[in-house]
Amino acid sequence: MASFHPDINYIGMEVQEGVIYYAAKKTAEMDPPVANVRLILGDVKHIQDIFARGEVSVIYLNFSDPWPKARHAKRRLTYREFLKKYEWILKEGGEIRFKTDNKDLFDFSLAEFKEMGWKISFITYDLHREPVKGDVAVSYTHLRAHETGAYLV
């Protein structure tokens, strides 16, 4: 996405070192190089310490860990406590773009967004038949192409 929109800054945040390393390697290998990508090794629990109130336009949550066990629901990136943090850093009119291939996580997330009073402007349960305009497929999608993905804005 960064190469298609050089006027937009993209900041990736990940708690696992291996994932950040892989993202940094892939970013460094981009041809032509991109100057609008930064990566943060950190926990989203502390996102309000990194971004100012109203600083972020869009948050992309792509294929995050579904934490399938009910007792781990509070770890899901769409859990209501995280949604409060996102709301704090998002600009007025900002949005979250959430993509997953896990239906249970999608349904949980949809309920959390609704519970927290978020306006949902687009939902699809089939990314392969209803691609999102301006959206870029990620390699994880190709690896799991046999599964149906879901998207929420």
What is the predicted role of each segment?
Residues T141-T148:
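Conserved small/polar residues in nucleotide/adenosyl-binding loops
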Residues N9-Y10:
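Short beta-strand element of Class I
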Residues L83-K84, D107-D126:
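Conserved Class I S-adenosyl-L-methionine
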Residues T78-E92:
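A short glycine-rich, Lys/Arg-flanked "PGG" loop and its adjoining helix->strand segment in the class I
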Residues T27-R53:
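S-adenosyl-L-methionine
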Residues A23:
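Conserved SAM-binding loop
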Residues Q16:
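Conserved SAM/SAH-binding beta-strand->alpha-helix loop
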Residues G93-K99:
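Conserved beta-strand signature within the Rossmann-like core of class I S-adenosyl-L-methionine
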